[in-house]
A protein has these predicted regions:
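Carbohydrate transferase catalytic cores enriched for Leloir-type hexosyltransferases
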Residues: 1-422
Length: 422
């Protein structure tokens, strides 16, 4: 969802500075596409379910689809007219459309493309343009135990090839910036520039208010938004709720809601859920909710959980806060950056202590009310517009620098002729 929100904010905020391209087997490796094409792809990723039932099947890979739509950040001075890619359907190859000063930036996660390094290298060689990338995390490299066999070597090949090609590297958190710098240094990879952190938005900048799925009532459930996979630590939430149901009156225990599709390496959890009849119907799974349903789930929950072992950012945490909902969150990696002082932090490996935190929150309505009051009075969500502005403000100096060099040094590397409009 993050990438789609940034797409929309870039177009709404900077329509004269942004265009879109996608992978294609053409000279330069990319062709221009319209914003309507991008928006249609984003909208097609929402597969909501009105009912609550055990989820099955594979999780939708948002970034694998959206990462094929790259950002082409264009300074105003490099354009004689508005970028045609905002209105046209499918346009020319990037070699025909690009001009000196343009900068290609991928904001998604292109690791699915085994040829991505070669594609970007060929693009840079053919155009002389600069390339920037937003790194969301390096978790497959740093914690390969959370992924299926073979994922880490593939990810490492792509990231090791693409980082040296990046003229600018953006990250979503200080934790990710540290991971990128540390890993690159350990691998003796020379970075074109130090990673720069951009603020990440929260909430839904294009609100479409849905209704709660059947079986859920306002204030009577705790919400855990995430793909159900081993790294996200749904198993700890399951253990906490199992103990709550043993030690508290059943009517005092809110329903636990997992909002997300089934991922990987959670076979034991799935069997436990089935064996307990979804904790005797105290556990519900909303499979891959669309944005409208997700907004309703946040809006009407009592509080949220996010117990992940390792994150690059932690969007469900900041989303929760943006809806005025307290989050019981993991204390690891970037998550405290997303939650600041407004979360109740727990150790994802210490279920006993995490249980006490959740139990106290459930048993002390005044405590929850006080925390929500502090959140309401002191928390200001970061908007997706702020994210878009930060990207443009960070990258436009890179593009302007490229344009200046092209004007004063029309060498073959700048490939000026390829970019002049007829």
């Amino acid at each position: 969802r993050l990438t789609g929100e940034v797409y929309a904010a870039l177009v709404n905020r900077h329509p004269d500075k942004v265009g879109f391209v996608r992978h294609a087997d053409v000279p330069g490796g990319f062709i221009v596409v319209s914003w309507q094409d991008v928006l249609a792809t984003y909208r097609s990723l929402a597969h909501g379910h009105d009912d609550i039932r055990p989820a099955s099947g594979q999780v939708t890979s948002w970034h694998a689809i959206l990462s094929r739509l790259m950002k082409d950040i264009r300074p105003r001075s490099a354009r004689q007219s508005p970028a045609p890619s905002l209105t046209a359907s499918s346009g020319p190859a990037i070699l025909e459309a690009a001009e000196p000063g343009d900068l290609l930036c991928t904001l998604g996660a292109p690791w699915h493309d085994a040829n991505y390094e070669a594609r970007v290298a060929a693009f840079k060689a053919a155009t002389g343009l600069r390339f920037a990338i937003l790194i969301h995390d390096l978790i497959p490299l740093l914690r390969p135990e959370y992924f299926d066999l073979g994922r880490a070597p593939h990810f490492e090949r792509v990231i090791a090839g693409i980082l040296p090609l990046a003229d600018a590297i953006l990250t979503n958190s200080k934790a990710t910036a540290h991971d990128v710098s540390t890993w690159a240094d350990r691998q003796k990879i020379m970075l074109g520039s130090a990673p720069r952190v951009i603020p990440i938005g929260a909430g839904f900048d294009r609100p479409t208010w849905g209704s709660l799925p059947a079986g859920l009532n306002t204030g009577e459930y705790a919400l855990f938004v995430s793909t159900i996979e081993v790294r996200k630590n749904h198993q700890q939430a399951f253990r906490i709720w199992s103990q709550l149901l043993r030690e508290l009156p059943r009517d005092q225990v809110p329903k636990l809601v997992f909002a997300g599709g089934w991922g990987w390496m959670v076979e034991d959890l799935r069997k436990a859920i089935e064996a307990t009849n979804h904790l005797d119907n105290k556990l519900a799974i909303v499979s891959s909710p669309d944005d409208a349903t997700l907004a309703a789930l946040y809006r009407e929950c009592r509080f949220t959980l996010y117990l992940s072992y390792y994150e690059g950012w932690g969007l469900p945490v900041s989303d929760s806060l943006s809806f005025g909902k307290i989050c019981v969150a993991s204390e690891r990696t970037s998550i405290p950056e997303a939650g600041s002082r407004f979360c109740l932090y727990v150790d994802p490996d210490n279920t006993t202590a995490a249980y006490e935190t959740v139990k106290n929150l459930i048993s002390s309505p005044n405590m929850l009310e006080q925390l929500e009051g502090e959140l309401r009075d002191n928390y200001t969500p970061t908007s997706w517009t702020t994210t878009a502005d930060a990207i443009v403000q960070t990258l436009l100096p890179e593009a302007e620098s490229m344009k200046a060099r092209a004007e004063f040094d029309p060498s073959p590397g700048c490939a000026l002729a390829a970019f002049r409009r007829a």
